[in-house]
């Protein structure tokens, strides 16, 4: 279920900043099919911020306006049919995080986009989470560094296009908490990051260079057989 702390003052301010960071991406230019895996906040917290016509939300349990309840590591979708996959703290909250990332990669179309939200372990929020016995961000099974996340994305064939750190706010419920405005604090004291990555198209290449005008001694079938991806 959804962590209850998202409903208090700390969580509500976090959600507002995450919505703003998401809106700033202008993802309507990314394609026609948007898929969110996992709920964060309400079921429409992010989907109503996009102008993409076809938006879908898949979760592992029924909550609000869910389009489909399914295992996130076995998506009932055809491969390469989604233009944008959005993971709002999804990998942080499930044990099978790499399987979920692999399933996301499979459904993203060629040159499609993956957007991920995560908590920054090197931040006041990360420190409070560790010192609280991992109870502060309840429902979070792990904190994933930007370096680790981008490493996974590259391994799955993505090109990281943008990393945005935000929400430099002291994690307290008091109404007078102060945002950390000074640039010297960023990005290391920002609570959250958003990664935008593009699925790379790997071109077909010939095993040996083709010399114009030189007669080829092998058949077309043999040449095609030597092509690698």
Regions from the PLM with identified roles:
Residues 85-86:
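Hydrophobic beta-strand segment of the Class I
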Residues 1-27:
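Class I SAM-dependent methyltransferase Rossmann-like catalytic core
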Residues 98-113:
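A short glycine-rich, Lys/Arg-flanked "PGG" loop and its adjoining helix->strand segment in the class I
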Residues 113-140:
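Conserved class I S-adenosyl-L-methionine
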Residues 159-190:
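Conserved catalytic loop of SAM-dependent methyltransferase domains
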Residues 131, 140-163:
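Short alpha-helix
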């Amino acid at each position: 279920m959804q962590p209850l702390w998202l409903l208090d003052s700390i969580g509500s301010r976090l959600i507002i900043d995450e919505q703003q960071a998401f809106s700033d991406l202008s993802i309507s230019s990314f394609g026609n099919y948007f898929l969110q895996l996992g709920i964060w906040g309400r079921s429409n917290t992010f989907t109503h911020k996009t102008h993409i016509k076809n938006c879908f939300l898949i979760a592992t349990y029924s909550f609000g306006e869910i389009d489909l309840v399914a295992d996130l590591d076995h998506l009932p979708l055809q491969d390469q049919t989604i233009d944008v996959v959005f993971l709002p703290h999804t990998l942080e909250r499930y044990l099978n995080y790499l399987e979920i990332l692999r399933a996301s990669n499979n459904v993203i179309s060629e040159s499609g986009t993956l957007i991920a939200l995560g908590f920054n372990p090197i931040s006041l929020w990360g420190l409070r989470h560790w010192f609280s016995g991992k109870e502060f961000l309840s429902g979070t099974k792990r904190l994933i560094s930007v370096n680790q996340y981008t490493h996974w994305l590259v391994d799955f064939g993505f090109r990281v296009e943008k990393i945005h750190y935000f929400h430099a706010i002291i994690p307290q419920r008091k109404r007078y908490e102060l945002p950390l405005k000074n640039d010297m604090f960023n990005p290391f004291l920002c609570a959250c990051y958003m990664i935008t990555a593009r699925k790379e198209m790997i071109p077909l290449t010939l095993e040996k260079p083709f010399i114009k005008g030189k007669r080829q001694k092998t058949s077309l079938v043999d040449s095609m057989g030597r092509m690698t991806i």
